[in-house]
Amino acid sequence: MKLGIVIFPSKMIQDKANGLRKRYDPHYALVPPHITLKTPFETQDEQLESIVNELHTIASKTNPFTLHVGKVGSFAPVNNVIYFKVEKTPELTFLNEEMHSGFFTQEREYAFVPHLTIGQGLSDAEHADVLGRLRMKDFYYEQPIDRFHLLYQLENGTWTVHETFRLGKGNN
């Protein structure tokens, strides 16, 4: 089974991202806009309970925090992904580190850059054009975050929530 761990932003932020993703992200229909805490990973069904228990522990050690989303960035030239930048708070960093150490041993492919993808799979010319236009616009959003989600991938490639984890002591 394939799992991933994400934070979903507010509906307002998702709507803004989806307005762009419809045009620039081929994965638009597979998963709602999100901030990835742990990239998708394969696991055996019998490990799911242990993963859920570990995520409850991580959530209980993390205080709710404010998510700051603003400006447009890109991972070019590594890949042509365009995204809304997400401020790297101590809580986001802690969550990401906890999900890549101890119980979770998956190696990182890239350094942790919190972001909300709005375009990917673009040609070099399209990437440059879209990025140039979006960088001229003013984007800034903030919202309180008090939970993250364990997702699993269905056979048709879409992702759905398996369980939600509330941040802070006594919330799980």
From Swiss-Prot:
Query: Motif range for HXTX 2?
Result: 115-118
**Tagged with keyword Repeat:** no
- Residues forming the motif HXTX 1 are 34-37
What Enzyme Commission number(s) apply to this enzyme?
3.1.-.-
Which residues are the active-site ones?
Answer: 34 (proton donor), 115 (proton acceptor)
Q: Does the keyword Hydrolase apply?
A: yes
Q: Write out the entry's keywords from A to Z.
A: Hydrolase
Q: Which GO terms describe its molecular function?
A: hydrolase activity, acting on ester bonds
The enzyme's first-digit EC class, named in words, is hydrolase
Which NCBIfam families does the entry mention? PRK13679.1 (NF010223)
Task: Give the family from UniProt.
Answer: Belongs to the 2H phosphoesterase superfamily. YjcG family.
Q: Which HAMAP family would you find in this protein's record?
A: 2H_phosphoesterase_YjcG
Q: What is the protein named?
A: Putative phosphoesterase BALH_1087
